[in-house]
Amino acid sequence: EGDHGSTYFHPDSDIAKKAIQCQVELQKQNGGDANIGRKLYPLLNQSDFKDIKVSPRQVYVDDSNPDWVEGFTKSTFTAMIKGISKEAISKNLISKKEIEKGINDLNRTAEGGGTFCYTFFKGIGTKD
């Protein structure tokens, strides 16, 4: 499971972070949890799983791996934020100008010298 709170990038951008937070809020409003990755251990434990193991699966992207720049930073993460733009604007979470700037700043992380980091969490356990 992913965890949007684990998103780090360069160049840093407060407005990009605000755009990401819109995704977190919209998912919460729809009954989801965009920060669920950090909660896997307690969720599995509360569900009576045993032998629980949770491990981070970090995705780190920079110029040295153009396939990941295109496939993850641009076509997955930034595209997801772009996809919630209209709803975030209509619910007054962010202005059109701000979300456009946030998306542009996320795209900047996919250009020369930029970096992008995100963590997924894998949880396993057994049930009696």
What label would you give each PLM region?
Residues 21, 38, 82-83, 119:
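A generic alpha-helix surface/boundary motif
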Residues 2-65:
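Conserved catalytic/acceptor-binding region of the Class I
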Residues 38-40, 97-100, 117-122:
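Short coil/turn segments at secondary-structure boundaries
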Residues 8, 93, 115-117:
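Residue-level preference for alpha-helix termini and adjacent loops
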Residues 53-113:
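C-terminal helical/coil "lid" or tail adjacent to the Rossmann-like core of SAM-dependent
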Residues 36, 91, 124:
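Short glycine-rich loop/turn motifs that provide flexible caps or phosphate-binding loops at active sites
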Residues 47-52, 67-71, 111-128:
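Core SAM-dependent methyltransferase catalytic element
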